[in-house]
Amino acid sequence: MKKGLLCAVCAWLFPIVNGMAQTQRSMTVDQLFNLIESGSNVLTAQKTGVDVASRAVEEAKSKRLPDINASLSASYNGNVLMTDRNYSNAKGFSQPHFGNSFALEAQQVVYAGGAINSGIRLAELQKQRSENSVQMTRNQMRFVALGQYLELMKLSNGIKVYDSNITLTTKLIDDIKSRQKQGMALKNDVTRYELQMESLRLGKRRLEDQKSIINHQLCNTLGLADVSIEPDIDLEAISDNLDSEQLLQTEAANLSPVLQQSSIDVKMAEQQLKLSKSELLPKIAVVAADNFAGPFTYDIPPIDKNFNIWYIGVGVKYSLSSLFKANKSIRRAKEQLRLSNTVHSVAAETVNNNMQQAYTMHKQSFVELRTQQKSVELAQQNYQVVNNRYLNQLALITDMIDASNIKLNAELQEVNARINIAYTYYNVRYAAGNI
C-alpha cells in the first residue's frame, strides 16, 4: 500500500520537477517574429531562391551583349592528289606542309522580335515571384506560430483558473470536514467534493500536458530547444478601433501576397504570349568576321602565303517553319493568360471574403468578451449565494457542485474570449497581408 502510494506521488511530482528543470523564456510577439525570421530553414531556402532568380535576370540581360568567337589552329597538310573524273590519270602535287589559321567572328543582335526583352522581363517577374513567395511564407509561419503562442497563453491562464478553483475547493472541503465533525454534514458531502477536487486536478493536468505539446511544437518552429516559452503580450492594448472595413479591404488589395502572386502570374503569362509571337518575326543582327590563314590552297599548285579576309554586314534570319508551328504555342500562351486572369479574379474574391470575415470576427470578439465577463460576474454571485445557502443548510451539495462547475466554465470561457481578441486582431493583419 505504502509502495503504491509512493509511486503515485513520484508520478505526480515528475512533470513538476521536469517543468522546473526547463528554462523559462519570456517572449513578446516581436521577438517571436524575429526568431521565425532567423531560425526558419524554409525562409532561408526561399531567400536563396531569390538570389538564384537575381542571377537569372543578369543572365537574361547578357543576351543583349554581342557574341564574339575566336579560333586559332595549326595543321600539317599532306600533298595533293588529282585525277580525272573517271579516277584515271592520277597526278601528285606537293604543297606547303605547315598550315595556320586565326579567325575572329562577332555578332550583335539588333532585333529579335521582342524575344530578348520578353526573356528579361520574364526573369525579372520570376524574381518578384520568388520575393513574394518569401513574404507569403513569412506571413504564414508568423500566423501559425502566433496561433501556438496565443494557445500557450490561453492554456497558462486556464491553469491559473484551475489553481484558483482548486484552492477554493480545498478550503471548502476543510469547511465541510469541520462541519462533519460537528455533526452538521455527511461523509458523503466530503466524498463528493473530493471527487470534484480530483476532477479539477485532472482538468489542470490535461491543460499542462496540452501546454507541453504546444510549447514543444513552437520551440521546433523557432529553432529553440528545452525552453518553456512564456508569452508576454498586453491584451489590454488591443482595441476594436481598427480602420474601417473599406480601408482594410483596400489595404488587402494592395498588400496581400496572395493577390500579388496571382498578379505576377498574369504578367508572366502576358510576357510568355509576347515571347511566343516573337517566333513569327525575323531576327536581324550585325555581323563581322576576320580570317587570317595560310597557305592558299584554292589554287594548284598551292601558294605558300598567308592571306587575310574580313567582312562586315547585316544578317537576317527567318524561320519558315514558325508559320505552321508558332500558332500552337501562341494558342497555348493565350489560354494560359486567360487562366491566370481567372485565378487572379478568384484570389481577389477570396482575399475580400477573408478580410470581411476577419474584420467581423474581430468586432464580434469584443462582444463575446463583454458577455463572458458578465457571465463570470453572475457565476461568482451565484456561487456565493449557493455557498451561503449550503453553509446555512438551505441547499444541497449537488447545488454547490453545479455552482462550482458553472463558475469554472465561465472563468475558462472568459480567458478564451480575452485571448481570442488578440487572435482575431492578428487574423485581420494576416488577411491584409502585413502581419
Model-derived features with residue positions:
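Bacterial Sec-dependent N-terminal signal peptides
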Residues: 1-33, 421, 435
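Periplasmic alpha-helical coiled-coil/stalk elements that build and connect Gram-negative outer-membrane
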Residues: 3, 27-31, 55, 138-253, ...
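Short segments within alpha-helical structural elements
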Residues: 199-224, 376-434
